[in-house]
Every structure is written in structure tokens, then in C-alpha cells.
Regions:
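Active-site beta-loop-alpha junctions of metal-dependent nucleic acid enzymes
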Residues: 42, 60-82
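An active-site-proximal beta-strand-loop segment
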Residues: 17-58, 64-65
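C-terminal domain-tail junction helix/linker
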Residues: 3, 107-111, 133-176
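Short small-residue beta-strand/loop micro-motif enriched in glycine and branched aliphatics
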Residues: 54-60, 113-116, 140-141
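RNase H-like polynucleotidyl transferase catalytic core
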Residues: 1, 89-93, 107-126, 142-147
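Basic, flexible linker segments flanking DNA-binding modules
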Residues: 1-23, 120, 174-176
Length: 176
């Protein structure tokens, strides 16, 4: 369910859909949170970071709660691999990414922050594409009764995506 929020911080759309360019590893990171259902009425939230240059998920976390801690825990996984003044971090305008806490993380690690324009999910197209892929290839035809079942399959799917899944972006090659 969408809950309107008042953004504490907004960044420009620096990436500006430059998806055709060649990027090095850790140069352009895309992120978002998506929802999965399990059990009768339960929800889980997956926060992930896609390294666009390598076309790999470099960090992710599944949680029962969609909150600032979920995103903080995800970005903390990559803090030591960020290239100061070079890494561009693109997200939508979700409350986690417009918070003072996230802005402080970005400033502390000298990250260039970029945000999609309001109502323009295509501005974060490759990340949205990943959500479509994981939901189609892993989730759609499976019923998950527990959080742990879902978590196990997400972990296995991301490993598959990063190491074995052939993609057009990578020239129909299996990732290295």
C-alpha cells in the first residue's frame, strides 16, 4: 500500500536514463525495494543494489519490514567498495532514499546521488527490469508458505542471476 510522505531530501536525476553507455564496476548503482507475498497474508520486502556496469546484484536484504533500516543494511554491505566522487547511486524517491539518514550516508561516502523523477519508474528501468525478471522466473509459479522458504529461493536466484543467467546487456555471455 502506498503511503504518501514528505521527502526530507531530493536529488536531481543525474543518471537521466543513460542506460546505453558503458560503465565500469561500481560506477553506476541502481537500487529499489520490492514486495513479495508469502503465507496467507504476510509480506516481505527485498532491497537490492544492481551494479549496472557489471549487471550484477552487489547487495540485497530481505526483511519483514519496509523501513529505513532495510535500505541502510543493504547499502552498508557495499560501503567499502564505493569509489568516492565517482560512484553514482540512483533510486526512486521512496521514503528511504529521501531521508536525512540516507543523505548523510551518501555525503559521508562521497557518493553522487541521483533520483528518478516523480512518477517516472522508467528512470530506474534496469532495476525495475530486474524486479520483473526475478518475479517471473523465480516467484510467479511458486507458493511460499514461510519467510525462510522465500529467503532461500531469493538467495539462490540472485546467485544464479549473477553467475549463470545470460543477458542481452552482457552480449549474451554468461557473467564472469
Amino acid at each position: 500500500t502506498y503511503k504518501p510522505h514528505k521527502p526530507q531530501h531530493i536529488a536531481e536525476n543525474v543518471l537521466n536514463r543513460k542506460f546505453q553507455a558503458d560503465y565500469n564496476a561500481m560506477e553506476v548503482l541502481l537500487t529499489d525495494v520490492t514486495e513479495f507475498k508469502y503465507g496467507v497474508h504476510s509480506k516481505a520486502y527485498l532491497s537490492a543494489i544492481l551494479d549496472y556496469g557489471e549487471n550484477k546484484i552487489v547487495a540485497y536484504k530481505l526483511s519483514r519490514h519496509n523501513n529505513n533500516a532495510l535500505v541502510r543494511d543493504t547499502v552498508t554491505q557495499i560501503k567499502d567498495t564505493i569509489i568516492p566522487m565517482k560512484t553514482l547511486f540512483h533510486s526512486d524517491r521512496g521514503f528511504q532514499y529521501t531521508s536525512h539518514g540516507f543523505k548523510n550516508f551518501v555525503e559521508e561516502h562521497k557518493i553522487i546521488q541521483s533520483m528518478s523523477r516523480v512518477g517516472r519508474c522508467i528512470d530506474n528501468g534496469p532495476m525495475e527490469n530486474f524486479w520483473g525478471i526475478i518475479k517471473e522466473e523465480m516467484y510467479r509459479l511458486t507458493t511460499y508458505n514461510t519467510f525462510e522458504e522465500l529467503e532461500k529461493d531469493i538467495e539462490a536466484y540472485i546467485e544464479f542471476y549473477n553467475t549463470k543467467r545470460v543477458t542481452l546487456k552482457m552480449g549474451l555471455r554468461i557473467p564472469a
